[in-house]
C-alpha cells in the first residue's frame, strides 16, 4: 500500500525519519513471544496498568448522529452484551432478527486509530509524560511510501536506513513531538503502529491485524483513558489473548461448519437471519471462500474472499461475510 501521495504538507516539519533504532531495544526485551498471541506480544510488559482502545466503525447513512459508531452502540443494537475481552464480530451478529438495520457500515479500522481517537488519546498521554517534545514513532514497513515526501527530496533507501526489527514485525522509525502521532493521519488516517516518549512512561501499540489499540502506562494514565468519554476503552491484562475468538453462542455452529468446510469443501448452515452456503476451494497457503446467502423474507447474494489457509482466518471470513450480507438492509 503506497501512501506517499496522501502525506500532509507539514509532514517533515512535525517528525523526521531516524536511524536511532537502539531507542526501541527496551521494547523487544519486554515483549512476550509473537506466537503467544497475548496483549504483551503486542505492547511491552512491565507497565503498571493496561487498556484496550476499541476502534469505532463508521455510521451508516446520514442519520444526524456522530460519524463514528462505538461498540457499545453496536452491542445495544444487537442485544449481545459486551464483555471485558469483547471482539467486534461477537456483538455485531445478533441472536434474532432486528427491526432496524445495523447503525454501522464496514468493519472498524485495523492497525490504526481514527484521527478523532488519536487526538483524544494525545490529550491524556501528554499529561502523563515528562518528555512530550521527544517521542518515537514506529510505522509498519509493509505500508510503504512514507519516505518519499519526508524531506522534499529523493527518499532515503530502506536499505540505508535501519528499521526497528521486532518479533513478527519491522518498523520505520521516526522522532518528533508527541503530536507527530497525527502527522500520518492527514488525510490518510494512519497513526503509528508503535509509539512512546523518551521517558518510556507509556507505550501505544496498534497491531496491523487488530481493530483495537493497546496502551500500557501508569495506573493514573489508564484510569484517565477508561474515564475519557471521547474514547471507548476497556481494561486489559498483559496475558489476555489477542487472537480471534468466537462468541459462545456462535461457536458450536460455526466451528462445526468450519470442520465440514475443511473436510468436504462445502457446507450449508441456517441462522436466525437466513441460510448461508459456503464453498472452499484450494488448500495450503492460499484458498478461496465463496459464500451465498438468502435472507428470511427475501434478499440474496454471493461474495468471495481469499484466505491464507488458517482456521482462524477461515472462521473470521465466514462470520464476517455472513454478518455483512445477512444484516444488509
Regions from the PLM with identified roles:
Residues 206-248:
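Alpha-helical oligomerization segments
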Residues 164-221, 268-303:
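Amphipathic protein-protein interaction modules
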Residues 146-151, 243-248, 277-280:
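Short, solvent-exposed polar/charged micro-motifs at secondary-structure junctions
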Residues 121-124, 257, 317-321:
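Charge-rich, solvent-exposed alpha-helical interaction surfaces
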Residues 150-152, 156, 249-269:
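Negatively charged, low-complexity tracts enriched in Asp/Glu with abundant Ser/Thr
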Residues 130-145, 233-242, 257-275, 324-329:
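Short glycine-rich, low-complexity/disordered patches
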Residues 224, 295-329:
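Mixed-charge, glycine-accented linear interaction segment located at domain edges/termini
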Residues 2-183:
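Extended, low-hydrophobicity segments enriched in charged/polar residues
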Amino acid at each position: 500500500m503506497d501512501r506517499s501521495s496522501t502525506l500532509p504538507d507539514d509532514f517533515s516539519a512535525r517528525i523526521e525519519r531516524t536511524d536511532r533504532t537502539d531507542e526501541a531495544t527496551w521494547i523487544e526485551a519486554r515483549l512476550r513471544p509473537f506466537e503467544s498471541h497475548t496483549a504483551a506480544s503486542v505492547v511491552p510488559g512491565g507497565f503498571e496498568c493496561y487498556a484496550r482502545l476499541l476502534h469505532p466503525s463508521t455510521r451508516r447513512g446520514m442519520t444526524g448522529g456522530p460519524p463514528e459508531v462505538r461498540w457499545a452502540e453496536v452491542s445495544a443494537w444487537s442485544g449481545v452484551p459486551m464483555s471485558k475481552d469483547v471482539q467486534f464480530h461477537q456483538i455485531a451478529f445478533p441472536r434474532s432478527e432486528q427491526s432496524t438495520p445495523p447503525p454501522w457500515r464496514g468493519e472498524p479500522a485495523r492497525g490504526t486509530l481514527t484521527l478523532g481517537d488519536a487526538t483524544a488519546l494525545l490529550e491524556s498521554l501528554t499529561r502523563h509524560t515528562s518528555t512530550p517534545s521527544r517521542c518515537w514513532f514506529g510505522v509498519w514497513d509493509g505500508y510503504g511510501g512514507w519516505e518519499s515526501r519526508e524531506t522534499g527530496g529523493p527518499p532515503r533507501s530502506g536499505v540505508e536506513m535501519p528499521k526497528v526489527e521486532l518479533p513478527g514485525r519491522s518498523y520505520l522509525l521516526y522522532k518528533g513531538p508527541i503530536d507527530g502521532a497525527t502527522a500520518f493521519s492527514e488525510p490518510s488516517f494512519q497513526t503509528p503502529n508503535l509509539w512512546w516518549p523518551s521517558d518510556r512512561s507509556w507505550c501505544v501499540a496498534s497491531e496491523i491485524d487488530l481493530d483495537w489499540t493497546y496502551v500500557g502506562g501508569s495506573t493514573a494514565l489508564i484510569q484517565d483513558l477508561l474515564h475519557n468519554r471521547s474514547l471507548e476503552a476497556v481494561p486489559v491484562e498483559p496475558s489476555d489473548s489477542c487472537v480471534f475468538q468466537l462468541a459462545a453462542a456462535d461457536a458450536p455452529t460455526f466451528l462445526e461448519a468450519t470442520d465440514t468446510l475443511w473436510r468436504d469443501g462445502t457446507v450449508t448452515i441456517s441462522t436466525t437471519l437466513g441460510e448461508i452456503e459456503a464453498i472452499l476451494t484450494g488448500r495450503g497457503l492460499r484458498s478461496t471462500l465463496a459464500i451465498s446467502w438468502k435472507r428470511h423474507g427475501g434478499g440474496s447474494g454471493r461474495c468471495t474472499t481469499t484466505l491464507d489457509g488458517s482456521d482462524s482466518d477461515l472462521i473470521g471470513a465466514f462470520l464476517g461475510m455472513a454478518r455483512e450480507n445477512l444484516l444488509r438492509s
